[in-house]
């Protein structure tokens, strides 16, 4: 098994930032009707000295395949501490690079669900 697949399995079996936040500033949930994956995210933010908003904490919950759950785990690790506006520019290529493997179009929908949830959540801020 290559290192990328091992990393995906590790994030699936031991997800980072899994659970719920106390008093989140925003919460959003969505699903993938093709495979039944469901991901929700909660965000806590604060205003930085320059006036921009920073993500202080993020948690995700849900259930689904190893790809969707690992993608959510990796994504929450990546964005914690980032300015919210910097998260708006994350794209398909970022998720693909983060996972490190080629995915079929159906599996890519699983991998992109957490990014979709994150971007819709920060749009609510």
Indicate residue ranges for each PLM-predicted region.
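Short beta-strand elements
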Residues: 32, 37-47
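Conserved interaction-surface patches within small, structured recognition/assembly domains
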Residues: 58-61
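Intrinsic structural disorder/low-complexity segments
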Residues: 47-50, 72
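Alpha-helical support elements that line or immediately flank enzyme active sites
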Residues: 71-81
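C-terminal binding/interaction regions
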Residues: 1-23, 27-28, 46-47, 54-56, ...
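Short, thiol/selenol-centered motifs that function as redox-active sites or metal-ligating centers
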Residues: 35, 63-71
């Amino acid at each position: 098994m290559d290192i990328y697949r091992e990393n995906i399995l590790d994030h699936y079996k031991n997800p980072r930032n899994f659970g719920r936040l106390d008093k989140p500033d925003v919460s959003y949930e969505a699903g993938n009707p093709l495979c039944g994956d469901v991901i929700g995210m909660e965000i806590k933010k604060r205003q930085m000295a320059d006036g921009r908003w920073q993500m202080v904490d993020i948690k995700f919950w849900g259930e689904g395949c190893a790809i969707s759950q690992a993608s959510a785990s990796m994504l929450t690790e990546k964005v914690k501490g980032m300015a919210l506006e910097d998260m708006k520019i994350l794209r398909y290529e970022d998720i693909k690079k983060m996972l490190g493997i080629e995915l079929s179009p159906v599996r890519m929908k699983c991998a992109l669900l957490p990014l979709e949830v994150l971007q819709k959540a920060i749009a609510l801020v």
